[in-house]
Amino acid sequence: MVKIDIENTRKAGGRMEEVKTIILKDVLPFVDPVARSHARRVLKDAEGYKEIVIDFRGIEFMGRGFEDEVFRVFTEEHPEIKITPLHASTSMLAMIRHLGGKQQ
């Protein structure tokens, strides 16, 4: 079961919801996010939100495939959705900036 904290509720008229928070440890409880398949699993219900906050609390390592799929591929395919890392380590934030993350 994936825990999702929705900051704001759906607006009338089918508009995009405001913010969806994804807690990585809840989605990937036994592994660090390393693969593109992990990224697709994390973001599978992300469409329809203006912003996705990814909470890295308790995550010690992030693989390049995961980072690239989330912070480059997904954001290029969905430029209307902002991806925000939360509780990411300094090295993870540097990786996001270095490998193409435009939205942090």
Protein language model regions, located:
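Amphipathic alpha-helical interaction surfaces in cytosolic regulatory modules
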Residues: 26-103
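Flexible, glycine-/charge-rich segments associated with ATP-binding catalytic modules
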Residues: 1-37
